[in-house]
Amino acid sequence: MVALSNALSRVFGSLAGYKFPSFIQKGINALYVKIFKIDLSEFEPLENYRSLNALFTRSLKKERPFDKSPNICIAPCDALITECAFLDNDSALQIKGMPYKAHELVGEINPLSPSFFYANFYLSPKDYHHYHAPCDLEILEARYFAGKLLPVNKPSLHKNNNLFVGNERVTLVAKDIQGNRLYFVAVGALNVGKMRFNFDKNIQTNAKARFTQTYSYNPPIKVKKGDNLGNFEMGSTIVLFIQNTAFKDLKEKNVKFGESIGEFHAN
């Protein structure tokens, strides 16, 4: 199953990256935009994308404004927040009634503290696929975990136990502005060709790997709130674990990158 789902994603990624003649590509792009009801008002017109992958990974034409206050946490992506809560004895929900152990997802040996708040951001095929820093960060490590590439939509989340933990993923281990540990997890999914990270081009995903790989940064990589961390090559999921933060009640709400989603408490 792992080999099949990963192979399908590699094939899809290759096809999505193929550049058809311009008049054919424009028609393909138009069909995709129509099927998924994509709003291109913040992006280049569809005829500017020479492949489906270029459309998937489209960049914003203009920077989005966001609150620059250091105590404000912003949404890292355009997404539906499917679950959000404080950890309960190291347990988080991939969806209602489907728990998993947070430390297994992020790659820690010991359970995570109940001071961690988590939020699942589901990026659908229509969404902007880049992900950004939710606050000022120092990235200490990037942990790559090989795994399946099962769909991460709601039917699949209800069907498959430990889906996030079993799927291919990359965990960014970081410190926030208060020195607290923060985990930013990019979860792979079916038809996601690759996950890319702008601060380290050596991180390879969906590359037939069958092992865990850790990329350590000494000194840490400093990124500012709103910086573009990377992108999926189709929709997937970001899971954010963050401490000492008062989050808004955003379960089942759509958010846009740059929206305020919480406020840091003083330690």
From Swiss-Prot:
Pyruvic acid (Ser) found at: 236
Annotated positions for site Cleavage (non-hydrolytic): 235-236
Pathway given in the UniProt record: Phospholipid metabolism; phosphatidylethanolamine biosynthesis; phosphatidylethanolamine from CDP-diacylglycerol: step 2/2
Name of this chain's protein: Phosphatidylserine decarboxylase proenzyme
HAMAP family named among the record's database cross-references: PS_decarb_PSD_B_type1 (MF_00662)
Post-translational modification as stated in the protein's UniProt record: Is synthesized initially as an inactive proenzyme. Formation of the active enzyme involves a self-maturation process in which the active site pyruvoyl group is generated from an internal serine residue via an autocatalytic post-translational modification. Two non-identical subunits are generated from the proenzyme in this reaction, and the pyruvate is formed at the N-terminus of the alpha chain, which is derived from the carboxyl end of the proenzyme.
Classification via PANTHER family: PHOSPHATIDYLSERINE DECARBOXYLASE, PHOSPHATIDYLSERINE DECARBOXYLASE PROENZYME, MITOCHONDRIAL
GO cellular component terms, A-Z: plasma membrane
Organism: Helicobacter pylori (strain ATCC 700392 / 26695)
